[in-house]
Design a protein with these regions (language model features):
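Short nucleic-acid-contacting surface segments enriched for D/E, G, S/T with interspersed K/R
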Residues: 1-11
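OB-fold/S1-family single-stranded nucleic acid-binding modules
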Residues: 14-44, 142-144
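His-enriched metal-coordination microenvironments in redox/metal-binding proteins
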Residues: 63-95, 108-112
Length: 151
């Protein structure tokens, strides 16, 4: 928690060569930024159009990870204008989570990166062996087992 808010962060740092007075290592923080963190969205039902079905790509990187009851996703999508893109995670079946994007018609711009995190408090590590993450990519629908995102 930070100021009463639950926040995920990403830190770019380098190890220092200097000796420290404690058992750990000293680092210099080069950059630190917060990651948008949210709960999963309510079920689809009447919200299907609200959640959108615009494509995005998940990037297989160290920042795409399921750990500590959070699913953090590094993604790429087209950002062309000044329209807000909405990214949501919905549980569409007992064993399926679906990542959805509503780009509000803003799909033709240059491809850019983004990070988003979702709280998965009710999903145990054992459940991750059976749960599938599904999303619409630029090349069609893709899936991955949640357990494959544990590092």
């Amino acid at each position: 928690p930070y100021g009463g808010k639950e926040v995920r962060a990403i830190v770019d740092f380098k190890f220092d060569d200097n000796a420290t007075a404690h058992a750990g290592r000293s680092v210099t923080v080069l950059r630190m930024d917060t990651i948008r963190t949210k709960d999963m969205a309510p079920s689809l039902s009447d919200n299907d159009k609200v959640y959108g079905n615009d494509p995005l790509e998940l990037i297989n990187s160290w920042t795409t990870v399921w750990e500590d009851n959070y699913l953090t996703l590094h993604f790429q999508t087209g950002f062309g204008g000044n329209k807000t893109h909405y990214i949501n995670l919905i549980q569409t079946a007992k064993d399926t989570l679906e990542l959805r994007q509503n780009a509000n018609g803003d799909t033709d711009g240059p491809i850019s990166n983004g990070l988003i995190a979702f709280r998965l408090k009710d999903i145990s590590p054992d459940d991750g062996n059976h749960i599938i993450l599904k999303w619409k990519s630029y090349r069609g629908v893709k899936t991955i087992k949640l357990s494959d995102l544990r590092k």
